[in-house]
Amino acid sequence: MEKPSRETFEGNNKLLIGIVLSVITFWLFAQSLVNVVPILEDSFNTDIGTVNIAVSITALFSGMFVVGAGGLADKYGRIKLTNIGIILNILGSLLIIISNIPLLLIIGRLIQGLSAACIMPATLSIIKSYYIGKDRQRALSYWSIGSWGGSGVCSFFGGAVATLLGWRWIFILSIIISLIALFLIKGTPETKSKSISLNKFDIKGLVLLVIMLLSLNILITKGSELGVTSLLFITILAIAIVSFSLFIVLEKRATNPLIDFKLFKNKAYTGATASNFLLNGVAGTLIVANTFVQRGLGYSSLQAGSLSITYLVMVLIMIRVGEKLLQTFGCKKPMLIGTAVLIVGECLISLTFLPEILYVICCIIGYLFFGLGLGIYATPSTDTAIANAPLEKVGVAAGIYKMASALGGAFGVALSGAVYAIVSNMTNIDTGAMIALWLNAGMGILSFVIILLLVPKQNDTQL
């Protein structure tokens, strides 16, 4: 049977399932470690600092390299980059489970970050290339279920698997899912940009981006420990500022930049990407609220995770509803409604001064609104970003969009954790949690304002 060409191939359910399975290798499986930190400490006989590095480094490296991977997908092939990403996940998972050596755990998690960097922009580009109109919006809904839904389920999933089967089974299952994804994607004709010449890769831009983001991450996670007046803190801050400035200058002059700032001339794309960064940042809600109910109320990790079940159920249900709202009202209204509902949920979860029973009720309702809001927002936002990118730059555009997701989550968790720790030490746990959750609500409010100002009422999508 003759293999279909790029011109004749139409995206089908087989390919879509393969794409979704590849996406959840990061958002569901790799992110599940957030709920098994104490178990990893015992298994690897190491301290919590080392484990926290291993947990956070995946999202950080994904965010740092996702834009570059998007450019590579445009140039060398989106199917090829997706397959490379899946294989990297298998390799990273194997390194994590084969020994009790902390260094291999960190290296494995780093490789999983590179895997996610390859998979996310490449799969979005495949959807852009092979699905049209309502089929694309449906495909993006399922992609969003894999990403937003996976992130909602990961904490509960990780705890359940670790309790019932052992934590290594998280990555054994991830390897199995990866192999199935490779099989389902096999046979799909390659898609790449026809107009981009194979210029030299922007290594200088990538190096500066990595230096800048690593510096910022150190400042956020270790700033209070270092002291803001210490020479080391000031030095790292200077490195972050200088590398950021050099990066902007270099990228504007480069003929083949890592980040094409021309994409941000489109207000709809800018609004979707910036709001996506901020709403991924509210992932800090989970770590703050879970830590508070365990330390402040004496709940177990399973009990803490159970409070957020309404979140994961609602985000999975509402993603398809968000797709229908997109088709009916365009992108702006669902994005605004989703963000507003999320802010209400944040405010309810932040009421840590209430008596235990009332707070638990507020938490359950708050998580319900939290998931409802994210579910409504997800598909319209993703569709806005992808539809407003020119076809020859869709890989880079998708890469920037997903960089916003990964870095928003990484820095949101880091900031929330830092604020919680600092304020708790100065006052008490209740106040520390409340202020940290207000920070997350503030990010939601800022996201709402950005959508209101930048995303047009009737989006001129390039379908």
Curated annotation (Swiss-Prot):
InterPro entries associated with the record:
MFS, MFS_dom, MFS_trans_sf
Q: Which residues form a coiled coil?
A: none
Q: Which PROSITE patterns match?
A: MFS
Where, per UniProt, does this protein localize? Cell membrane
The answer to whether UniProt assigns keyword Membrane to this entry is: yes
Function of the molecule: Multidrug efflux pump that acts independently of NorA and is one of the factors that confers resistance against diverse quinolones and chemical compounds.
In its UniProt entry, what is this protein called? Quinolone resistance protein NorB
Q: Which organism is it from?
A: Staphylococcus aureus (strain MRSA252)
